[in-house]
Amino acid sequence: PDWRIEMRIKGEDIAAAYREIRGLSRKVEDPEYIRICFSQKASPGGYYWIFPKGENLVNVGLGVQMKEGFPNPKNMLYRSVLSKPSFLDSKVLEGGGGLVSTRRPMSNMVGNGILFVGDAAYQPNPVHGGGIGPSMVAGKLAAQAACRGIEDGDLSMESLWSYNVEFMKWYGAKAAGLDIFRIFLQKCSDDELNYGMANGLIKEEDLLKASLGEDLKLTVTEKARRFFRGLGRPSFLRALEKTAKNMKKMKSLYMRYPQPREFEVWLRQVNDIVREMEEMTF
């Protein structure tokens, strides 16, 4: 049946990841901080992380974008991260890998008598892949929609649609904006990211705010200051400004998530923004 549900996900929207829990031979440096590193060389299209879990214990892992010919994430972790001096004589306590969606949520998560939640609905955070929180709330919202449908004797797509609306306003809008930022980051080379950070085009607070789902707000004064710093690579600055605008557009679209009769028009607008980002060059 035509339930307007996306049944396939592109490889570019999936991360293949591998992580280990490791006991270190020395104390963790700055245990109150987590480390996330975006590097096309070390983790193509993804990032690697080091999360302290105790004085001598860390969760260390790496994810790569599942484009054609993508490298083995375990091999990349050992080559790019575990070869560092801080992991000398460390021991593996636990290890494992898997696949994580790294895109905005499924555009429609309901059909006649069915609701999609969690990984099945592409609900993990598009930037870092964490999905426990969003999935738990989605489960509650889906259950509430199902209960209302059972009480009314109507489990049609239209009856369950409230789950879409509530989830998209609560989290989908944030994730949609993050998806735009994720596409931008995956297009950046290591040199471009380093250049942007060194010259203030991408600042630490920009990355933090964006990873938390906030807009990249550029005031007129800030725009002017960044413009002059970006004279060396004006196309990179234009791409950053386009990304900020499209993040805001996507969040606005998802906050105005439609009823079924307006869904096709809304979806075309979403896909147009995503296509613009995917075709962007700099």
Predicted regions and their residues:
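Predominantly flavin-linked oxidoreductase catalytic cores and closely associated redox partners
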Residues: 1-89, 121-123
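Charged, low-complexity, helix/coiled-coil-prone segments
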Residues: 13-28, 76-92, 104-111, 215-217, ...
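Solvent-exposed, flexible loop/coil residues
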Residues: 26, 38-42, 103-104, 113-114, ...
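Short, Lys/Arg-enriched charge-dense amphipathic segments
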Residues: 28-37, 73-77, 109-122, 174-188, ...
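A general structural signal for short secondary-structure boundary/capping elements
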Residues: 31-41, 64-67, 82-86, 94-102, ...
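FAD/FMN-dependent oxidoreductases across multiple families
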Residues: 68-142, 151, 157-170, 179, ...
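C-terminal helical "tail/cap" subdomain of flavin- and related membrane-associated enzymes
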Residues: 147-282
